[in-house]
Amino acid sequence: FRPSSPPAFDSPVFLAALAEVRQISDTRTPEQDANAKFWDMPPGTVTPPGYWNQAAAQLAVKYHLSEREAAHVLALMNMVGFDAIIASHEAKFTYWMVRPSQADPGIQVAIGLPNFPSYPSNHSTISAGMAAILGAMFPTERARLDALAEEAGRSRILGGIHYSFDNSAGLKLGRTIAAWALEHDVNGHEAFTLR
């Protein structure tokens, strides 16, 4: 599942992404700050997987899932969440991409700076993967869930700790893992659609 390599430090893509983070850092609005802090979810809080489990539980109630159906959704979604963090960290420690504030010390972060490499974004990978499972199970909710995953990823750029290419690679990686899981779901090799 490893994503392709991030852009080189001296490439136009890298420099543009770094400039975007610096521009946000220099002009961060209260709304951007609030968004970054909402999605921060550091250890000791609900965390991104906890957020998506809460969303799944709410959907299970909303659509009156049986215990078996709810268990299936939660199991498949959490399997994807675990695989997402493993795949994301495998890539992080393959590529060793520096954080924006390491590349430009003038960048002020709005949230905690994780002590591991930047590429790809864990939040993006986890959120895209878990949202994709929920979107497959609840197709009428797919657009809303995808938008939340995009927002979770974008929040890390707003917080000053990720580049846009970290986000896009994480979103793609999470969706790829979810697609693989849905294809190989033990329930007849395809996920059931609930609502």
Feature locations, PLM:
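Acidic/polar surface patches and capping/hinge elements
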Residues: 1-195
